[in-house]
Design a protein with these regions (language model features):
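Conserved ABC ATPase signature
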Residues: 49-53, 57
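Conserved ABC ATPase "signature" region
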Residues: 26-44
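A short, proline-enriched helix->beta-strand linker immediately N-terminal to the Walker B motif
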Residues: 68-72
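Catalytic Walker B motif of ABC-type/P-loop ATPase nucleotide-binding domains
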Residues: 74-77
Length: 166
């Protein structure tokens, strides 16, 4: 995973702080706890090691570390991969909440149609070493590009009722 297994969650969140900031330990502890709570983890999660966390908690801890330096841009690579549908939906909601409240730009690489529909306001579909289509979910639904059409209007999309939007 994205976390260092030999470090607690709090220590993981502090890694970028130690690397790029010169702050007293007490302040780093406070900032790390703030980020841990910001992503919806309980305060005691800071004392746990990654192996003691559920999949959803691990994803949240990694997100807390990504937010440690208050970035303007966050990159997420398959953030809901390996999560059950309920945890994935909760993570998508968290991403949207953080994006909106912190005015973040979020670049998300995902194959999860639910995540695309819930958390993304613009999408770029990559194929054949280029961007096939770029735009809103509505643009994807109207696209006549064969791969995009199959992906957004195929069987899985119909199960999500995305195809009804076309």
């Amino acid at each position: 995973g994205a976390l260092f297994s030999a470090l607690t969650v709090m220590e993981n969140v502090q890694v970028p702080m130690r690397e790029y900031l010169d702050l007293p330990k007490k302040l780093m502890d406070e900032l790390a706890m703030l980020k841990i709570e910001l992503v919806g983890l309980p305060p005691d999660a800071g004392r746990k090691f990654p192996s003691e966390l559920s999949g959803g908690m691990t994803k949240r801890a990694a997100l807390a570390r990504a937010l440690a330096l208050d970035p303007d841009i966050v990159f997420l690579d398959e953030p809901t991969s390996g999560l059950d549908p309920i945890s994935a939906a909760e993570f998508d909601e968290l991403v949207v909440k953080l994006r909106d409240t912190m005015d973040l730009t979020v670049y998300m690489v995902t194959h999860d149609l639910d995540s695309l529909f819930t958390a993304c306001d613009r999408i770029a579909v990559l194929g054949n070493k280029k961007i096939l289509v770029e735009g809103t979910i509505d643009d994807m639904m109207k696209s006549e590009e064969p791969w995009v059409k199959s992906y957004f209007r195929g069987k899985r999309a119909r199960q999500l009722d995305l195809a009804a939007r076309a």
